[in-house]
Amino acid sequence: MAKIDLTEYLEKLKEPEDRETVANREYQQQLFLEYVVRGDNFPEQRATLLRDYHAGKELTGPKGLRRRLGAFDLEYFGRAYLAHYFVRRSPAFHGELDRIWREGVLKGKNPDTDAKEISRADGCRRAIEAPRGHAKSTTFTFKDDLHAALYAYKHYIIILSDSSEQAEGFLADIKTELEENAALREDFGELEGRVWKSSVILLANGGKIEA
């Protein structure tokens, strides 16, 4: 029986993970460079972020460029943190949904710096009608609720649906991301709070999401 070089074997085991790590880092870099110059809102902040990138500032982490750009660019937030849901550029309809959230909920402000002001602003009532399969719930109930909870500009989020089971299903998806999403955990830290149930969760940053 041929002998196995244990060191070589262990190195081979590491290779796929290393390749995946490198590929993810390259993806995040390319995505950032694409989106930081693509949007038309917050031009001064975008220019600052681009300068910071070329100056060698960290892309990821609690003070990273990814988190800072994701605060006011909702499409980038989806593709940077939830790439398994948002796999390509958003169509025009999704851009319209993002615009509704930016203007109606965020009030045109940057939640990374103005979270308290956003949270104290008047609410927004909008009715959105579109055929099934147009990702309305994925965009609003999933992505945007996560965005509001992570950047802490909404402290009590209620998920309403046709049934409690369906609402809890959306909350379960959000919980999964908070528990297992490496990018979210790297930039926003451990967010699991003292209540973590199928119908309600409390986040470590003080936020609450209830189905």
Cite the ranges covered by each PLM segment:
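Conserved nucleotide-state-sensing and coupling region of NTP-binding domains
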Residues: 160-210
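Generic structural signal for beta-strand residues in well-ordered domains
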Residues: 119-121, 150, 194
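N-terminal accessory segments
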Residues: 1-123
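Contiguous, well-ordered alpha-helical segments that form the cores/surfaces of helical PPI scaffolds
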Residues: 95-102, 138-150
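Walker A/P-loop
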Residues: 120-145
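Short acidic, glycine/Ser/Thr-rich loop/turn "cap" segments at secondary-structure junctions
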Residues: 123-131, 152-162
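C-terminal PAP-associated
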Residues: 16, 138-139, 171
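Post-Walker A helix-loop "phosphate-sensing" segment adjacent to the P-loop in P-loop NTPases
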Residues: 147-156, 179-182
